[in-house]
Structures are given as C-alpha cells and as structure tokens.
Amino acid sequence: MNRDYLRKVAFGISVDESIPSDPLVWAQNQFDAVPDFIWEKKLPTLDEQRDRYGHWVYQDREVLREKHKNDRLAYEKEKDHLRKITGERFFESLELSVRHSTALASDSPAFERMWHFWGNFFAISEKDFLASFSTGVYQREVIRPNMVNTFEDLVYAVTTSWCMLHHLDNAENIGPNSKEGVRENSDNDKRKVGLNENHARELLELHTLSPEANYTQEDVVEMAKVMTGWRHLWNNKKLEAGPIKFQTEYHEQGPYKILGKVYDIKDFNTVNQGKELKIVIKDLANHPSTRKHIAKKLCQHFVCDEPTDEMIASIVKAWEKNDGNLIEIHKATMETVFQYGLNHRKFSMPELWLLQNAKMLGLFYLYMFPQGFEFKGSKPSRSHKLVKDILWEIGHPIYRAKQPNGYIDLEDEWLSPELIIRRLAAARRFADITNPNVNYDQEYFENVILKNFDHPDNLLKLMKESTFYADRFAVFANSPEVMRA
C-alpha cells in the first residue's frame, strides 16, 4: 500500500509509473544531491536578472518619466516597449514553467516538494517588480543549492542575498554612529537616517527563532545593528540593482547583545568585514527554538495543520544529531510523514493541488515546449503564460505573496467558497490541457485512482457516476480524497 504517501511527500504518480517497492527509501534517496532542472533551454542567472531589473527601473524612473512628463500616452507606449526588451512580463512565466516542468518530470519529486516548501518559507513578497525579475531565480540559485548544506548555510545565503536584502529594505538600515550615518545626519537635509528593523525582525520572527523564543524589541534593535552595512552598491545607471557588498562606512560597530549573549569582536570592521552577521546567524540557526519552529513548519506542510509533539521531536532529534545538516533533516521529515502522516489528512494549497492533478492525470499544459523556452526579447505568448495564468486563476500566484511570511499553509486559509469555486472552474478546463495521446475514459480514471489512493472505493464510485467528459475532471480534482493528501 502506501500509495497515499506518494502524494503526501510528492505529487503522486502517473499511470505509466511503477509504485516504489519501498516508498520511504524512494523518498529519502532523493535528498543526497541537488537534481537538475528538466529544462534544456538557457536559464537566466541572478546577475543577469539584476542587470535587467536595473535597466528597467533606471529607464522608467530616470528617463521615460522625465521625457514624457507631459504626455501620458507616449510614456505608456514607450514603457510597454521597455517591458518587452527587458522581459518584465516574461520571466515570471518562464520561472513558473521551469518549476512545474521539473516537478512533473523529475525523478526526484520529493526533493521538488521540499524546494517548494523552502521557497515559501523564505518568501519574497510582492514588491518592486521582484516577482517579474528576481524571485524565481533567487529560489533557483540561492535556496536550491543550499538544500544539501546546513540550515545555518541556507539562512546565511538567503539573508545576504540581493533579493532578500532589497525585499526587506536593508539598504535603509544605516548605523546612526557609522561614518555615513554621522555624515548624513549632520547636514542640513531634514531627512535623517538610522536603523531599519525590517530585515532583523523577519530574521528572528520568521526565518529562525519564532516569537516562542521570547526575544525582545531590544534584541531586534541589536540584530538590526549587526545587519547594518549589508547593502547593494549604488550605481547611477542601475540604481538599487548593484551587487551586494558589506560596506563598513554604513555599519554600526558593536558590541551587541542578542538573547543575553554579548558579541564583541575587536577591530571587526578592519579585520573580518561582515563576518559578525555569520557568527550571530550560527547561533540563531542552532537555537532550540529555531529547531522546533522549523520542525513544526515541516510537519504542517507534509503531515497536518496541528502536528503533535512527537512528530516535531523526531525531526528535532535528527537536526541535533546531524548539526543542522539539511539532507538528514529532510530525510527525517520523510520518515516522520511515513510514520505519522497516513493517519492524518492535509488540505493542499492550490499550486500543490494543481501539480498533483497534473501528475496523476497526465495533464499536458507544457506540451508546446518539450525542451523548454527562453527569453528572446519578446512578450510571452499565451502558451508561455499558461502555468502563470492557471496559478492566478486558482488564487495562488507563487511569487507574489502579500506578506514576508509567504502563503499560510493551513486549511482555514484556503477553504473559502471563492477559492473552492476557482478550483472547480479550473478543473473543468483541465479537459483543454489533456494529453492528446490519452483516452480519458472511465477506465483511465480508475487506473489513476488505483495507482494513487490506498482507499479508492469512494472516489471510484464518484467517477462512475460522472458521465460527462469535463465533469470527470471537476469531480476527480475536487473530491475530498484529492483535495487532501
């Protein structure tokens, strides 16, 4: 049995695939190395996307607005051309298509599920065209490679990435006693600079400790001081899109006191530039509250909304035993799901629901691009945008979370009548993106069900009562068995 397990940790299996003889080993073996993307075309790099973003914001803010300040129509026309040549409306569709192509065709679907988890955990919310240029490549190049390192490594990479630093305004976090802070506050400009706590607060609240650690506002302030100086290099032609560099002239020197521990690194700014952040992150990433917080989030994603202490403890134990090695944490999560998950049902967020239906039913929504596609200076076609459009339709635009805590992975967030109606409508249109080589008759649906469900009787009965072609997709996709894994 254990067919349900394949949906709890991955996306289910297609009718052409074999059920693994040992599902737990099958899942755990996927975490030893980072798998390749299922995409043959060239993918943009972080640096390339920063350059494109820089060209976009500079041309729009500094050139077009001044050039056409008295002609709104001319401004919109030229801005539309700018969108085209920079790919402002192209790259989100590209990144989502890469994500889905890999999820559906990879030999490591459990790894892909875990990547999706971390992408949402270290979310970049909708701000400043980040979804258009940067969020997808940030998840590819910052999060994904670090999934075989330690949690400490992952947090540090995310915290010091251009995308996260820009997202949480750390360029505005300036030490008031730093060289630049003193200079800017001593001139006649009414605008004064100082600490910006955004990034520090999210690092403590969301990415490491959680509020259960009972840290104080003073801890947040001290963390913000540590993080001063981590900022992009300003460029008159790229504005805020310059590379990240620790800049001592903006840094508030210590000592600092965080969670009762004093960090006093002598001559830090001239000897070990920027390394104090790494030292503090090491302590935060290995704090007992962090281990419990992350373990609970993993259980909530893969097992159920209200995980037990026993579930959480099994992941924490692996974390402690392996010094935060993510490979072992991921494997422990798979074992926890195997041990506890089959007695619990987890309501699927919309994207997961879509991917599981696509995998099980063999939906063919990337059929026009068997080798992928790449940016060639044009707007995306309707086919390029298909994945993005479906995600918008079902209320889950992955790269556009409204808050830094990402999308809330709890049933109450997704069980509204409006969102259920959206899924019903989308499922009825699954008939338009089916595999042309498959006959989606009653027998096919029966094979899908028997391959993916340990208790198939109710779903088989529902499908036998669905006589209309389009109805089969809606009934299957929105059945309790498919909505919850």
List where the protein language model places each region.
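Short, compositionally biased low-complexity segments
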Residues: 1, 6, 87-90, 191-198, ...
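Flexible, low-complexity segments enriched for small/polar residues
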Residues: 1-18, 24, 28-31, 35, ...
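Intrinsically disordered, low-complexity N-terminal regions enriched in serine/proline/glycine
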Residues: 4, 52, 57, 74, ...
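N-terminal accessory alpha/beta regions
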Residues: 5, 13-145, 171, 184-185
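General "foldedness" signal
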Residues: 19-20, 40-41, 45, 114, ...
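Active-site substrate-binding loop specific to GH73 endo-beta-N-acetylglucosaminidase modules
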Residues: 75-81, 96-99, 131-366
